[in-house]
Curated annotation (Swiss-Prot):
Organism: Shigella dysenteriae serotype 1 (strain Sd197)
Compartments it resides in: Cytoplasm
Keyword set includes rRNA processing: yes
This protein's name: Ribosomal RNA large subunit methyltransferase K/L
Keyword GTP-binding attributed: no
UniProt record similarity statement: Belongs to the methyltransferase superfamily. RlmKL family.
Entry's EC annotation: 2.1.1.173, 2.1.1.264
Length: 702
């Protein structure tokens, strides 16, 4: 009896144990990452040929304690290598693990190689050559703390390489894991199986091979036992012949069918090639189509299983499309696949929740470094009185109501950008802004007392409902997360896409960027203030301080300002402002753009203006500004400097986002100024619920 070890992906050990026992293995013992077992020579070959789950089959040769590199050398040399190798066999060493002595795996591999070679030369035998690419024998050494475990890798290349897939192709899951997913899916061979996001077809191919009794090792060309002296070619040929006979019989007797589809024509072509190379191409129908086009291939029965490894996203900007995809799949399953089973393998349990289905079973597994889950569902047959489940129903109803209210108003006023929803319902704590045919959903970061998983799931529900209610393409929804705004974090860079969208606001054309910054380049709550500036600016010299992207300057210019001066500290936003001005035909010397610390520029300037707009941050301590600024504390000093630049009969429009801001009216009077609060006049109906989003004042000479 041979003592053997089969390695596998984490989470598949018990499944592998059952498989090995069915092959005839005895004394199976599960450990993390594999199964120890025993069997005769025939079982060695059967496990290599038939195991769908094992990554490698190892023949342990011994262990040694390693307190120095000499211990490793002597421990390896103690094994009778000359009885292991056939004459002329090449070999390679795979060394993994480190300790205080062996701190480099390449060094460890070199010591093992030296010990093996010296074992031959000391007996005056020809030394075996090393072949790292295609060796006849692979020696595996695993060092854990002070113990080195030495084994022959009888597999050669990993057993997931079945021989039917182009090794250069990108594979989201290995064939061994795919086989486990099929086994755990609840699918019964002889019933239909469908993968609507099949990629290169691995799940369907593994299922078809299982159903037709086709050994996973049948197509492999090289093995790790070709240079092993104990290899029994006669028994191996018997095992191989039996596998070929069973495969032919299984294929001839199988009558059910497999269906695969994907939106990428290139991967579908690869899937067809892989299936043909696996010998089961005639059983699988592959089509190029999107999940949205998915239909039941057998509407009159029999029932089957939908099995897939859907995409998941690591970036925030990919989530809306994935949420929409999973929500859509859930709806299609309920509408067209009543009575079927569904099994999905994913690295994102939250996305699976978007299906709005209750899982009957779930399994955990590792896909490389990723923690994954497989969930199995049974889709109930629909009845005439069954109603589709609503996602975030209260939120969806409010959004639908707001849409009806605001859409007509915005169209009549020539507004393409407006707020549709602003945390109207406390449990759905987001803002939803429309920019032409795009939508930005901003999640206000939930308090730490809220369970993170529940908050994330609620956000996914919000996105699914938003896409459904507004009828937009998922790729036109942008998702952002922000703290409740404390001042304007307008300079925070989020990305580098550089994609700008032209929008209209009354008679102005403006550029917005929905993805690269926390804000988009257009503060929607100031829309009416900008229109007022346009109406007040005819024939006047206009100054815009803390100008951001210059949208107020555009309105002033279009309103007939004699000149405009736009000042901001950011070169990025001044260039953006210049693009906005140019888009509206506002060019030339009468439209100046100045990059400067606005407070320092204000103290040094000696020009005169008829109309000044200033929208400073609530608080700023930027390294590029000379002093820290607090709008509540410093607004009088600001007014003193502004008064010096204000021409007789001129007006200052002063706005800020400080909640609870108190204007020092007595202090203003001492400066010879008076203030009229116009906040309510500047709040449009889409911001009527948030009356503290800004405050706005007109300041003139007393």
């Amino acid at each position: 009896m041979n003592s053997l070890f089969a390695s596998t992906a984490r989470g598949l050990e018990e499944l592998l144990k059952t498989e090995l026992e069915n092959l005839g293995a005895v004394e199976c013992q599960v450990v993390q990452g594999g199964v120890h077992f025993k069997g005769d020579t025939r079982l060695v070959y059967q496990s290599l040929m038939w195991s769908r789950l094992a990554s490698r089959i190892m023949l342990p040769l011994g262990e040694c304690k390693v307190y120095s590199d000499l211990d490793l050398y002597l421990g390896v040399q103690a094994i009778n290598w000359t009885e292991m190798f056939t004459p002329g066999a090449t070999f390679a060493v795979h060394f993994s693990g480190l300790n205080d002595t062996i701190r480099n795996s390449q060094y460890g591999a070199m010591k093992v190689k030296d010990a093996i070679v010296d074992a031959f030369t000391r007996k005056n035998l020809p030394r075996p050559n090393v072949d790292r690419d295609a060796p006849d024998i692979r020696v595996n050494v695993w060092l854990h703390k002070e113990t080195a475990s030495i084994a022959l890798d009888l597999s050669g290349d990993g057993l997931h390489l079945r021989g039917y897939r182009d090794r250069a192709g990108i594979a989201p899951i290995k064939e061994t894991l795919a086989a486990a997913i099929v086994m755990r899916s609840g699918w019964q061979p002889g019933t239909p199986l469908l993968d609507p996001m099949c990629g290169s077809g691995t799940l369907l191919i593994e299922a078809a091979m299982l159903a037709t009794d086709r050994a996973p090792g049948l197509h492999r060309g090289r093995w790790g036992f070709s240079g092993w002296a104990q290899h029994d070619e006669a028994i191996w040929q018997e095992v191989k012949a039996e596998a070929q006979t069973r495969s032919r019989k299984g294929l001839a007797e199988y009558s059910s069918h497999f269906y695969g589809s994907d939106s990428d024509a290139r991967v579908i072509q690869r899937a067809r090639t892989n299936a043909r190379l696996a010998g089961i191409g005639e059983l699988i129908t592959f089509e190029v189509k999107d999940v949205a086009q998915l239909t039941n291939p057998l509407p009159k029965g029999p029932y089957g299983t939908v099995l897939s490894n859907p995409p998941y996203g690591e970036r925030l900007d990919s989530e809306p499309a994935l949420i929409a995809l999973h929500s859509l799949l859930g709806r299609i399953m309920k509408n067209q696949f009543g009575g079927w089973n569904l099994s999905l393998f994913s690295a994102s349990p939250d996305l699976l929740s978007c299906l709005q289905l209750r899982a009957d079973k779930q399994y955990k597994a590792k896909n490389g470094p990723l923690d994954c889950v497989q969930k199995n569902y049974h889709v109930a047959e629909s009845t005439p009185d069954s109603k589709p489940a609503m996602v975030a129903e209260d939120y969806a109803n409010r959004l639908r109501k707001n849409l009806k209210k605001f859409e007509k108003w915005a169209r009549q006023d020539g507004i393409e950008c407006y707020r549709l929803y602003d945390a109207d319902l406390p449990e759905y704590n987001v803002a939803v802004d429309r920019y032409a045919d795009w939508v930005v959903v901003q999640e206000y970061a939930p308090p730490k007392t809220i369970d993170a998983h529940k908050a994330r799931q609620r956000l996914f529900d919000i996105i699914a409902a938003t896409i459904s209610v507004l009828g937009i393409a998922p790729n036109k929804l942008v998702l952002k997360t922000r703290e409740r705004q404390k001042g304007k974090n307008q300079y925070q860079k989020l990305g580098e896409k550089g994609e700008f969208l032209e929008v209209t606001e009354y008679n102005a054309h403006l550029w917005v960027n929905l993805t690269d910054y926390l804000d988009t380049g257009l503060f929607l709550d100031h829309r009416i203030a900008r229109r007022m500036l346009g109406q007040m600016s005819k024939g006047k010299d206009f100054l815009n301080l803390f100008s951001y992207t210059g949208s107020a300057t555009v309105h002033a210019g279009l309103g007939g300002a004699r000149s405009t001066t736009t000042v901001d500290m950011s070169r990025t936003y001044l260039e953006w402002a210049e693009r906005n001005l140019r888009l509206n035909g506002l060019t030339g010397r009468t439209h100046r753009l100045i990059q400067a610390d606005c407070l320092a520029w204000l103290r040094e300037a000696n020009e005169q203006f008829d109309l000044i707009f200033i929208d400073p941050p609530t608080f700023s301590n930027s390294k590029r500004m000379e002093d820290a600024f607090d709008v509540q504390r410093d607004h009088l000093a600001l007014m003193k400097d502004l008064k010096r630049l204000l021409r007789a009969g001129g007006t200052i429009m002063f706005s800020n986002n400080k909640r609870g801001f108190r204007m020092d009216l007595d202090g203003l009077a001492k400066l010879g100024l008076k203030a009229q609060e116009i906040t309510q006049k500047t709040l449009s109906q889409d911001f009527a619920r948030n009356r503290q989003i800004h405050n706005c004042w007109l300041i003139t000479a007393a």
